[in-house]
Amino acid sequence: MPGRAEAGEAEEEAGAGSGSEAEEDALWERIEGVRHRLARALNPAKLTPYLRQCRVIDEQDEEEVLSTYRFPCRVNRTGRLMDILRCRGKRGYEAFLEALEFYYPEHFTLLTGQEPAQRCSMILDEEGPEGLTQFLMTEVRRLREARKSQLQREQQLQARGRVLEEERAGLEQRLRDQQQAQERCQRLREDWEAGSLELLRLKDENYMIAMRLAQLSEEKNSAVLRSRDLQLAVDQLKLKVSRLEEECALLRRARGPPPGAEEKEKEKEKEKEPDNVDLVSELRAENQRLTASLRELQEGLQQEASRPGAPGSERILLDILEHDWREAQDSRQELCQKLHAVQGELQWAEELRDQYLQEMEDLRLKHRTLQKDCDLYKHRMATVLAQLEEIEKERDQAIQSRDRIQLQYSQSLIEKDQYRKQVRGLEAERDELLTTLTSLEGTKALLEVQLQRAQGGTCLKACASSHSLCSNLSSTWSLSEFPSPLGGPEATGEAAVMGGPEPHNSEEATDSEKEINRLSILPFPPSAGSILRRQREEDPAPPKRSFSSMSDITGSVTLKPWSPGLSSSSSSDSVWPLGKPEGLLARGCGLDFLNRSLAIRVSGRSPPGGPEPQDKGPDGLSFYGDRWSGAVVRRVLSGPGSARMEPREQRVEAAGLEGACLEAEAQQRTLLWNQGSTLPSLMDSKACQSFHEALEAWAKGPGAEPFYIRANLTLPERADPHALCVKAQEILRLVDSAYKRRQEWFCTRVDPLTLRDLDRGTVPNYQRAQQLLEVQEKCLPSSRHRGPRSNLKKRALDQLRLVRPKPVGAPAGDSPDQLLLEPCAEPERSLRPYSLVRPLLVSALRPVVLLPECLAPRLIRNLLDLPSSRLDFQVCPAESLSGEELCPSSAPGAPKAQPATPGLGSRIRAIQESVGKKHCLLELGARGVRELVQNEIYPIVIHVEVTEKNVREVRGLLGRPGWRDSELLRQCRGSEQVLWGLPCSWVQVPAHEWGHAEELAKVVRGRILQEQARLVWVECGSSRGCPSSSEA
């Protein structure tokens, strides 16, 4: 029973607890319903003191609500305060309602529906009356402080208002002054406009007056001319009248005076009086008449006045007369005024007459002056016209002479074309004859060799063979001289080889044949000198091709017999568009040609595991090797098979390379050597083959993507008008890979930023471009300091050494008869004229590599010191991504060790993670850039150009004293040479764009931001995502 009672009490308590929790939830749900209104209206700074006094929040909660940065606006702070109070349960709800009742009664009424009673029950329960008094005192003190601060603020605002009022008054006064000034300016502008209009009007009036004056001058001139004519006519009439009067007088005298003649004469005299005299006389008579009438009237008035009591009629008559007198007086005054005006007009007319007479005299003087000037100009014009006639005659003569010269020039061009056709025909005939002669001499030499081998003796020792080899080789190379332009003794000696008609030349040829073939009767292989002599006899080329026979030993290509198609002018022009480099190439390339690798293996049998012979030379010699190490004499075949020899065109092969690319290359090589070029082979076989495969794949696909290539080097200019002048780092788009069936490509130059086509033209294909670059490299004058003859004699045998190679799996003492003749090794060189590239638009932030490497650390620091640069850039560890340098091989031809790059993947991942945030500044070289591109990370490569002008500013960036300008320039230019081999595009900062270190950092930053928005050109095959077949 007690247990059941306790259980019942626990259930009642649990039910009461659950009921209170539900009630609290309902209350808070009501508050949450208007949470958005409370959060916008309440100020947490007013509520927190009361809530702290009620002990529902503490100092930490108050600081979190009011001072934390998590809640920047008041709405967030109010919401956080409400969340804290909800966690306090019922006490928090009651304290929140009392705070609302105390500070925000309208919101209290909204929540509860009751009017606020201004009670502080929570404080009384927690603190008691003392706590409430303390709270109220605190609130009063806070309100007093608020009021005091408000009063201070009001005083400050009033003072500020007075200051602003004074400023406003000053501004109003200034505005009034400006308005007055503006009004004055407006008035002045109006006056100026009125003055301008008046000036224009006066100018128009002046112009009209001038026009009127000119018109009056013309009228005056015409009037003067008319007056002259009239005066002449008057003079003639006067003369005629005088004659008639004389005749009449004679007749009157003869007849006597007629009646009334005197009266008629008087009338005539009266008629001849001028009108003005009549007018004056009339006026005088009228004046006298009026004066007389006036006197009579005055006398009558006096008489009437003297008589008293005059009647009214007389008075009226007197008034009438007085009125008439006044009118007469007025008319008299008018007549006087009219007379005065007439006199003034007469005086003005006289003045005008004098003025016109003066102007007439002036005009006469000007007329005489102008007449003299006109005569002078007429004389000058006549002289100029005479000179022009002479010049026209000379011009006609020059045109006739030019036409004659042009006709002669056209005739000379026609004759030149005819001569060219004749020269081509003669060259074709000569080629046929030389071909026939070559075949006959080859057959003769073959027969002689077979005859001598049939009479063979015992075998010589290896030392004697090697001695004869070196002696014959040195003698042969010392005799290989270049012909004299004027036909000196060298040309005479060469005629013995070509078979001249002179007797002593034939004797010398016979002796040389005996000397050459005296060792061929033995079974031991012939010496190198014998091979050279035989090749020279079989190829009757000019003396300038004396070194081209060496390519059968040092290169992999066996020379074809000399054919007409290769020596014609058309084929020569196709290979050498700028002309044949005959003497220059022969002299400039001889020394470098002998410095290449030379290996001649003389043995009786093939070493185990060795390569099979690839071609059979004359006298049964078997050649093997590739075009990098040179052809190698392997063995001499014996028996009937050794007598077989084809003097036809021999096949050109290279070890390990097949396809149309290598065949085209071999044809070009043969064509170059037949024309006297002895250039070494610098072609990259792997690049050529891969490029050719990518080109064939593009040509087969009709809807393939554009085939973009980048020019790695500046190609030589060509004479073809349709050829493009290609410079380094230019992007080309291939349009036609077999343009007109020639060794040219039809391409379009592309803008690397917008991919728009700029201009079109032809460029040499891959093999042709390599040959042109080889010629350009070999013809540089800087590497030609000494003559080829002295260098040939000194270095021909110094670079040769006799070694005994060991066959694979054979003991050390085997095969004592095998001798290997090898020179010093030469480093590999490879000319890649083009590279297959593709454009990429990288949206992520790309890392930055700064070159030269010696300037990168200080330049990175300067870049980070710029304002707001650390928001865009960050520094990565200054360790090379390429790991350790490649270890040099211990022996020539040994495989190169692979670089050990521990932790490379982690560094790559670190760079990839930082790419999306900021530009990563790296201190890497060219090899590190290749590693990044292989991992599909495309950096922005910025190279700072260093010249002699800015080397001092660059030296200040190093931070290490003791550097000389020459050393710094050499190191920076060395890093610039490495840029051309990078698999991605790069940008250079010219020296003229910056003057000091800070300006350089700003320029570099601007270039980085520009390059981030541009396309990046990457070589196909340089990254893992691109197929390796397109690697060029």
From Swiss-Prot:
Keywords for this protein: Coiled coil, Cytoplasm, Phosphoprotein
GO BP field: activation of NF-kappaB-inducing kinase activity; negative regulation of cell migration involved in sprouting angiogenesis; positive regulation of canonical NF-kappaB signal transduction; positive regulation of protein localization to nucleus; protein-containing complex assembly; regulation of apoptotic process; regulation of immune response
Residue stretches in coiled coil: 138-456
Keyword Phosphoprotein: yes
Tissue: Detected in adult heart, kidney and liver; lower levels in intestine, placenta, muscle and lung. Also found in fetal lung, liver and kidney.
Modified residues (Phosphoserine): S18
UniProt cross-references to Pfam families, sorted A to Z: CARD
Places the protein is found: Cytoplasm
Regions of compositional bias (Basic and acidic residues) in chain numbering: 261-276, 504-517
InterPro entries, sorted: CARD (IPR001315), CARD_CARD10 (IPR042140), DEATH-like_dom_sf (IPR011029), P-loop_NTPase (IPR027417)
Record bears the keyword Coiled coil: yes
Domain of life per record: Eukaryota
Alphabetical list of CDD domains matching this protein: CARD_CARD10_CARMA3
Chain segments carrying region Disordered: 1-23, 253-276, 481-553
Gene3D superfamilies listed in its UniProt record: Death Domain, Fas, P-loop containing nucleotide triphosphate hydrolases, SH3 Domains
A GO molecular function held by the record: signaling receptor complex adaptor activity
Domain CARD: residue ranges: 23-115
PANTHER family (alphabetical): CASPASE RECRUITMENT DOMAIN FAMILY, CASPASE RECRUITMENT DOMAIN-CONTAINING PROTEIN 10
Disease: Immunodeficiency 89 and autoimmunity: An autosomal recessive disorder characterized by adult onset of recurrent infections, allergies, microcytic anemia, and Crohn disease.
Assembly mode: CARD10 and BCL10 bind to each other by CARD-CARD interaction. They both participate in a complex with MALT1, where MALT1 binds to BCL10. Interacts with TMEM43; this interaction is essential for EGFR-mediated NF-kappa-B activation.
Entry function: Scaffold protein that plays an important role in mediating the activation of NF-kappa-B via BCL10 or EGFR.
Name by which UniProt lists this protein: Caspase recruitment domain-containing protein 10
Origin species: Homo sapiens (Human)
Lineage of producing organism: Eukaryota, Metazoa, Chordata, Craniata, Vertebrata
Gene behind the chain: CARD10
